[in-house]
């Protein structure tokens, strides 16, 4: 049964990649001329109308939305062209530390990010760039979830993200946990969470967790999640030790 389910998932993933490739191709072409035209109009009449005029607001809206569409197209393209992994024996803790450098000066003020990395881990066959992208996707998701919870609740609560690694010798795996105290995963989408285009974000594409799941599958691992009793969610990446 599990093998059949995995085959079906891979078949759906291939079909969705083709859809993503076509969407990216069809949307990408007209975006640049639309943006350039809006910017040209914006510059041409900037001195003739007030900053708050309907023309200025409308052209700025066009420019902003085109930028949003370009980001979506980029995600579609990344999903459609997930490269085959090129694993080499690596220190997953080092990959995590290097990746988290990106967040040192960019974390929202009310969110703390801490690590609990096991000091004794075996090296793993990893594509370091792909694992780096997995960590970024999971941390970005955690930040979004915490920020969403903050807008829904009137009571301020410090946002917390915890990243931990651990070795499970009995199962011959290393686990990477990314835990947050955000909104958790809604039961309505839990069964489809790793399917493409499943999202609750206003401007999300629903591809981040799909890319995470596919990448870890390519590493012969598993991606799991569980809602926490205290609120929030913990994503667990299980990677085999060779």
Predicted regions and their residues:
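Conserved HAMP-HisKA connector
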Residues: 4-26
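Histidine phosphotransfer helical core of two-component systems
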Residues: 31-67, 87
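A conserved beta-strand-to-alpha-helix junction within the catalytic ATP-binding
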Residues: 86-100
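Short helix N-cap motif at coil->helix boundaries in the Bergerat
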Residues: 92, 184-192
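Conserved catalytic submotifs in the C-terminal HATPase_c
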Residues: 110-122
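ATP-lid-like helix-loop hinge signature
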Residues: 143-172
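Detector for a conserved hydrophobic position within an alpha-helical segment of the HATPase_c
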Residues: 216-217
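Glycine-rich ATP-binding loops of the HATPase_c
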Residues: 220-226
């Amino acid at each position: 049964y599990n093998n059949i389910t995995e085959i079906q998932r891979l078949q759906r993933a291939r079909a969705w990649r083709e859809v993503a490739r076509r969407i990216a191709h069809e949307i990408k072409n007209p975006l640049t001329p639309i943006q350039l035209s809006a910017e040209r109009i914006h510059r041409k009449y900037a001195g003739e109308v007030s900053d708050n005029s309907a023309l200025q607001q409308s052209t700025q809206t066009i420019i902003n939305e085109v930028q949003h569409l370009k980001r979506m197209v980029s995600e579609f393209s990344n999903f459609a062209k997930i490269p085959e992994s090129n694993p080499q024996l690596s220190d997953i803790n080092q990959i995590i530390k290097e990746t988290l450098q990106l967040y040192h000066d960019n974390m929202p003020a009310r969110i703390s990010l801490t690590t609990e990395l096991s000091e004794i881990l075996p090296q793993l066959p990893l594509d370091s760039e792909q694992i780096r992208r997995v960590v970024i996707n999971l941390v970005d998701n955690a930040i979004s979830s915490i920020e969403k919870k903050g807008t829904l609740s009137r009571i301020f609560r410090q946002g917390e993200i915890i990243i931990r690694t651990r070795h499970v010798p009995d199962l011959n795996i290393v686990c990477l946990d990314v835990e947050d105290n955000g909104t958790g995963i809604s039961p309505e989408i839990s069964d489809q969470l790793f399917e493409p285009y499943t999202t609750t974000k206003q401007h999300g594409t629903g591809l981040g967790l799909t890319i995470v799941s596919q990448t870890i599958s390519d590493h012969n691992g598993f991606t799991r999640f569980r809602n926490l009793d205290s609120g929030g969610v913990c994503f667990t990446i299980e990677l085999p030790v060779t």
